[in-house]
UniProtKB/Swiss-Prot annotation:
The gene is fabZ. The keyword Lipid metabolism applies. One of its GO terms (biological process) is fatty acid biosynthetic process. It comes from Pasteurella multocida (strain Pm70). The active site is at H57. Keywords: Cytoplasm, Lipid A biosynthesis, Lipid biosynthesis, Lipid metabolism, Lyase. InterPro entries: FabA_FabZ (IPR013114), FabZ (IPR010084), HotDog_dom_sf (IPR029069). This is 3-hydroxyacyl-[acyl-carrier-protein] dehydratase FabZ. One of its GO terms (cellular component) is cytoplasm. Its EC number is 4.2.1.59. It comes from the Bacteria. The keyword Lipid metabolism applies. Belongs to the thioester dehydratase family. FabZ subfamily. Involved in unsaturated fatty acids biosynthesis. Catalyzes the dehydration of short chain beta-hydroxyacyl-ACPs and long chain saturated and unsaturated beta-hydroxyacyl-ACPs.
């Protein structure tokens, strides 16, 4: 009988900030909980009642904006791309496009949003991914995303 050992790869916030140019309040990936280079990445974003977006979206009934859910997924693809392609000092990954975005339910203060992105293909510096965001195992958003690797 063979036993395979799997090691979880975690990336903490300080390492994420070395990979992405985003900073508070626009860094939307709190922690990577596991990934496989060139294949997939799973990250979390904890939604606090103190998120700046809740001041205007909506004060009496705060809902995390869909565009920020997509941005969080895009940032997760950026982390996966950086880990896959060993980002150089003079390179940056830009969010290039989004297709087939679907929103299934609202994300509220107190939720932990789990972001799962999967590598599809890379061609001429453009990388295509699929992404799914869930809360408590329920899909809140899904989309296809592209990022472009360019000189900084």
């Amino acid at each position: 009988m063979t036993t395979e050992t799997t090691t979880t790869k975690i990336i903490e916030a300080n390492e994420i900030m070395k990979l992405l140019p985003h900073r508070y309040p626009f860094l939307l990936v709190d922690r990577v909980v596991d990934y496989e280079e060139g294949k997939w990445l799973k990250a979390v974003k904890n939604i606090s009642v103190n998120e700046p977006c809740f001041t205007g979206h909506f004060p009496e009934q705060p809902i995390f904006p869909g565009v920020l859910i997509l941005e969080a997924m895009a940032q997760a693809t950026g982390v996966l791309a950086c880990k896959t392609y060993r980002q150089l000092e003079n390179e940056i990954y830009y969010f290039a496009a989004i297709d087939n975005a679907r929103f299934k339910r609202p994300v509220l203060p107190g939720d932990q949003m789990v972001l799962e992105v999967h590598f599809l293909k890379e061609r001429r510096g453009i990388t295509r991914f699929t992404g799914v965001a869930t809360v408590d195992g329920q899909v809140v958003c899904e989309a296809e995303l592209m990022c472009a690797r360019r000189p900084a």
